[in-house]
Swiss-Prot record:
Family label: Belongs to the ATPase gamma chain family.
Annotated localization: Cell inner membrane
Gene3D superfamilies: 3.40.1380.10, ATP synthase, gamma subunit, helix hairpin domain
Functional description taken from the UniProt entry: Produces ATP from ADP in the presence of a proton gradient across the membrane. The gamma chain is believed to be important in regulating ATPase activity and the flow of protons through the CF(0) complex.
GO CC annotation terms, alphabetical: plasma membrane; proton-transporting ATP synthase complex
Alphabetized GO MF terms: ATP binding; proton-transporting ATP synthase activity, rotational mechanism
GO process terms (BP): proton motive force-driven plasma membrane ATP synthesis
Keywords annotated in UniProt: ATP synthesis, Cell inner membrane, Cell membrane, CF(1), Hydrogen ion transport, Ion transport, Membrane, Transport
Positions of disulphide bridges: none
InterPro entries cross-referenced by the UniProt entry: ATP_synth_F1_ATPase_gsu, ATP_synth_F1_gsu, ATP_synth_F1_gsu_CS
Protein's name according to its UniProt entry: ATP synthase gamma chain
């Protein structure tokens, strides 16, 4: 009977765990829809800023913004690492962290040091354990990304690049493909090249000019900063949509596994109970026969 009591305890424990994972699955599904809506809402703005930046960068060849000039003499590269603040989202963070480690090694082989900005608690913890130099950080963003919370940390990298202290700035995050698929990517944020201004189908942007007020340099300077900020915001929005999707899938898998374990434990319990009843009946029959 002690064995049966232990099995009942295990069944109860797994049932309680399944209730938790089922609730988390439902919460993640709700948050996922909102995160996807925010991500899709941010895309038109990012696309429009991309188009304007393309026109302006091609229309003013006499002026080159610092973001469009390679700092070939710099021996340090920057990376902005976007991860989640919470876990229980499958291999989402593991994949982007693994890709980041590979990028770190590639840069070090080229004689480049790496200085990082962490967006998300998981990435910050990883960078500290990895021994990387963390220039700035943003954690506890919540379920809704706000640009004003990101600007300070991102500006640290932008300023260093403008001063010629960084050879390049990379952006590592998880791109949302669909509910079942997310992809860890590392993109070069700076220096900007013509590839940054191509359309999604790979077609280069057309060249035509604007009338600038007060002058072209002032407008280009402001716009390219906004352009980079838009890229970072879009990356964070994509990462949040990926997080909720991955968490929903992970919790669904956990709930399904818990259901399977409960069924298996219930079968073991029934067999044990049947064996105990059979044993008791045998003892009763044997005792009656002896009498």
């Amino acid at each position: 009977m002690a064995g049966m009591k232990e099995i009942r305890g295990k069944i109860k424990s797994v049932q309680n765990t399944r209730k938790i994972t089922k609730a988390m699955e439902m919460v993640a599904a709700s948050k996922m829809r909102r995160a996807q809506e925010r991500m899709r809402a941010a895309r038109p703005y990012a696309d429009k800023v991309r188009a304007i930046a393309a026109h302006m960068s091609r229309a003013n060849p006499e002026y080159r913004h610092p973001f469009m000039v390679a700092n070939e003499g710099a021996k340090t590269a920057g990376i902005i690492l976007v991860t989640t603040d919470k876990g229980l989202c499958g291999g989402l963070n593991t994949n982007v962290l693994r890709a980041s480690v590979q990028k770190f090694k590639e840069l070090e082989e080229k004689g480049q040091k790496v200085e990082a900005t962490a967006i998300g608690g998981k990435g910050l913890g990883f960078l500290n354990r990895f021994g990387a130099k963390v220039l700035s950080q943003v954690v506890h963003l919540g379920d809704t990304p706000h640009l004003d919370k990101l600007i300070g940390a991102v500006k640290t990298q932008l300023d260093l690049y403008s001063e010629g202290k960084l050879s390049a700035v990379y952006l590592a995050y998880t791109r949302f493909i669909n509910t079942m698929k997310q992809e860890a990517v590392i993109e070069q944020l700076l220096p900007l090249s013509s590839e940054h201004f191509e359309a999604d189908d790979g077609t280069p942007a057309t060249s035509w000019d604007y009338i600038y007020e007060p002058d072209a340099q002032a407008v280009v300077d402001e716009l390219l900063v906004r352009y980079v900020e838009a890229l970072v915001y879009q990356a964070v929005a994509e990462n949040m949509a990926s997080e909720q999707s991955a968490r929903m899938v992970a919790m669904k898998a956990a709930s399904d596994n818990a259901k399977t374990v409960i069924s298996e434990l219930q079968l073991v319990y029934n067999k044990s109970r049947q064996a105990a009843i059979t044993k008791e009946l045998s003892e009763i029959v044997g005792g009656a026969a002896a009498v």
